[in-house]
C-alpha cells in the first residue's frame, strides 16, 4: 500500500526528531548549505575571517567595494542511513498506531547512533591534535581547557560558537574543578541542549561513545564543523512482496548525509597516551 506524501513527511519528521535527540554532534555542527543533498554534493559557506574590512564613508566619493569574507567548499554527500524495520504479521494498512510509533522511535534511535559515530570520526580525523599526551588531572584540566579556548579565539572563533565534548573521565575531573559551572546554574535553553555545564565560557557536553578511550576532549565549534543531510527516500510503511514475508510490511526510508571540518585548526582533539 502506498503512503500519501503527508504521512511520509510526518513519519520522516518523527524519525528525524528521535535521531536529533539521540545524536549529540548532529545538533552542534553547522547545517548551512546551498544545493540539493540528494544530488550527491552541496556547497557550504566557509567564513574566511572574522575581520570585516571597514572605513569611513565619504559622502562625495562613496565607498570602495570589498569582497565578502566567505568562500565556498564542496561537501560530498557520501554517507547513507536507512530505516528498514520489519512489521511481521501486519500489512501496511493494518499496522496499529502504537506499533508504528514504536518502530519509528527504534529507527530514529539507530540512525542517531550511526550518525553520531560518523560525525565523531569526522572530528577525530579532520581535527588537530592538541597539547601533549599527558593525561589530564584535577589540577591541570582547567588550564588545558583555557589554553584550547585561547587557541580558538586566536583563530577568530567566538566563545559562544565553541562547544566541548568530554569523556566521562574528563567530566569527572571537571566536576572537581571550582571553575566548572554545573548545568543547574545555566539557563533552561542551554540545559535543553543536553549540556552538563560550562567552563571558561564554553558549553560542555559529556560524550560516552569515543571509540578511542584515549580521547579526553574535543573542542569544536558551530562554524567550521559541517553536517548536511536529507531524505533520499522518505519514511513510509510498505507491504513486503519478497516472497519470504507473508502478510507483513516494513517501515522503510533512506537518509543521506555528509560531514566535513573545513578548518582543521579550529577543532582541537586532546588525547592521553
Question: Model-flagged regions — what are they?
Answer:
Residues 1-73:
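N-terminal "assembly arms/tails" that initiate or stabilize quaternary assembly
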Residues 11-20, 24, 28, 144, ...:
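Short, Φ-rich (hydrophobic/aromatic) sequence segments
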Residues 38, 42, 46, 150-233:
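Extended oligomerization regions of viral-like shell subunits
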Residues 49, 211, 223-224, 256-258, ...:
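Short, glycine-/Ser/Thr-/acidic-enriched flexible segments
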Residues 52-55, 86, 95, 173-176, ...:
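Short helix/loop capping segments that flank catalytic or ligand/cofactor-binding pockets
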Residues 64-101:
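Long, hydrophobic/aromatic-enriched structural stretches that serve as scaffold segments
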Residues 89-157, 268-273:
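Alpha-helical scaffold segments that mediate packing/assembly in large oligomeric complexes
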Residues 239-273:
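Extended, compositionally biased alpha-helical segments that mediate assembly or anchoring
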Amino acid at each position: 500500500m502506498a503512503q500519501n506524501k503527508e504521512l511520509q513527511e510526518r513519519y520522516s519528521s518523527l524519525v528525524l526528531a528521535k535521531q536529533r535527540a539521540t545524536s549529540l554532534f548532529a545538533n552542534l555542527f553547522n547545517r548551512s548549505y546551498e544545493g540539493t543533498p540528494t544530488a550527491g554534493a552541496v556547497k557550504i559557506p566557509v567564513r574566511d575571517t572574522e575581520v570585516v574590512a571597514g572605513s569611513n564613508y565619504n559622502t562625495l566619493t562613496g565607498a570602495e567595494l570589498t569582497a565578502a569574507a566567505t568562500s565556498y567548499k564542496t561537501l560530498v554527500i557520501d554517507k547513507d542511513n536507512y530505516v528498514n524495520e520489519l512489521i511481521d504479521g501486519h500489512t501496511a494498512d493494518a499496522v496499529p498506531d502504537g506499533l508504528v510509533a514504536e518502530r519509528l522511535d527504534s529507527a530514529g534511535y539507530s540512525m542517531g547512533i550511526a550518525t553520531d559515530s560518523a560525525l565523531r570520526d569526522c572530528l577525530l580525523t579532520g581535527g588537530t591534535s592538541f597539547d601533549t599526551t599527558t593525561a589530564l588531572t584535577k589540577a591541570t584540566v582547567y588550564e588545558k581547557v583555557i589554553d584550547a579556548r585561547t587557541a580558538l579565539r586566536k583563530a577568530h572563533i567566538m566563545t559562544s560558537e565553541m562547544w566541548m565534548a568530554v569523556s566521562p573521565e574528563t567530566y569527572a575531573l571537571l566536576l572537581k574543578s571550582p571553575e566548572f559551572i554545573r548545568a543547574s546554574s545555566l539557563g533552561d535553553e542551554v540545559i535543553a541542549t543536553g549540556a552538563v555545564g560550562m567552563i571558561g565560557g564554553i558549553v560542555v557536553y559529556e560524550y560516552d561513545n569515543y571509540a578511542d578511550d584515549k580521547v579526553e576532549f574535543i573542542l569544536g565549534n558551530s562554524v567550521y564543523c559541517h553536517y548536511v543531510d536529507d531524505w533520499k527516500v522518505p519514511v513510509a510503511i510498505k507491504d513486503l512482496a519478497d516472497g519470504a514475508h507473508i502478510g507483513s510490511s516494513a517501515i522503510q526510508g533512506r537518509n543521506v548525509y555528509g560531514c566535513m571540518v573545513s578548518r582543521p585548526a579550529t577543532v582541537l582533539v586532546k588525547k592521553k597516551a
